[in-house]
Each structure stands twice: as C-alpha cells, then as structure tokens.
C-alpha cells in the first residue's frame, strides 16, 4: 500500500515499550515511506514533538537510519546490479530527494544514483553501464570514465528523453 506520509510506518520503541508511531521528528522526511521498528534506549518515553526535535540522541537515530539505508542500497547495487536497476524507478524519488535535502546522505549515495544512457551496455570491469529491460543505466562517474580524452567534459540532462532523443544522440 501507499505510505502514510503524515503518520509514517515506523514504530518507535524504548527497550521494547511502545513510544510512538509519529516518526516525522526522528527520521528524515525522505525516509518516511520506510516500514519497520526502531527500538532504542535513546528514545525518551515522554514523547513530545519539541522534545524529539531538540534531542541530539534522537537526531543521531535519524542519521543512523539514513546510513543503514545507503549501505543497503550500496550492497544491493554491488551484489545484484540488474536487480538494483530494475528497482531504480521505485527508489529514485526517495534517493534523489534525500540527496537534495541531506548533504551527508548525498555523499553516501552519490555513486548509487543511476541515469539512463544511450551507451551500449557492454560489460566492463566496473559493470557500467547496467543493462536492464532493454534500457541502460549509468552513474555520473561511469559516464565521466567513458569520455574520450579529446571529448569535452559535458553532461547532458534531459527532462523528456523521448522528445529530445535526436539532440541526445549527437
């Protein structure tokens, strides 16, 4: 089902005692669609929004969750690049929003963000580009590594790759 952005689908516990299911103050906004349980002795039993927002221990839980998400995405891409590319359309909005909102998360996922490419999907040592369902995906670093020495270092971004296909194949 759809994630409830207001309520969240992560339950907070302190030493196995239910505290809250209002997690907006604990995890970053871009991770609210996650489902699960956080059980930590660092979560205060007396929960108020202002207490959660100002508690340094609670903020560190949000950073920890973001780090675990980026680690899991990195492992998925490394272990199953094609599976990662297949899931990318569903993951992309959250990863990209997270990268825009959280500088630390952006550094953690910079090599995990995929872009569609017109490059032929031929297997290289680094596995770039990744072929998936007739499409090819690359990372920004993968694109840069394929540039010829005499080629200008430029990156083309398209908002509508079908309508702009002629220009992109230049």
Which residues make up each language-model segment?
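Conserved GHKL (Bergerat-fold) ATPase module
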Residues: 1-170
């Amino acid at each position: 089902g759809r994630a409830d952005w207001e309520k969240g689908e992560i339950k907070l516990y302190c030493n196995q005692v239910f505290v809250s299911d209002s997690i907006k103050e604990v995890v970053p906004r871009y991770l609210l669609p996650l489902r699960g349980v956080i059980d930590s002795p660092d979560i205060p039993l007396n929960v108020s929004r202002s207490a959660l927002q100002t508690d340094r221990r609670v903020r560190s839980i949000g950073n920890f969750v973001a780090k675990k998400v980026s680690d899991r995405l990195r492992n998925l891409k490394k272990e199953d690049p094609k599976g990662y590319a297949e899931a990318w359309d569903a993951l992309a909005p959250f990863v990209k929003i997270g990268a825009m909102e959280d500088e630390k998360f952006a550094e953690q996922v910079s090599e995990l963000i995929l872009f569609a490419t017109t490059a032929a999907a031929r297997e290289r040592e680094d596995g770039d580009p990744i072929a998936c369902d007739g499409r090819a995906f690359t990372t920004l670093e993968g694109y840069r590594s394929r540039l010829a020495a005499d080629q200008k270092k430029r990156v083309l971004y398209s908002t509508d790759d079908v309508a702009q296909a002629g220009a992109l194949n230049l």
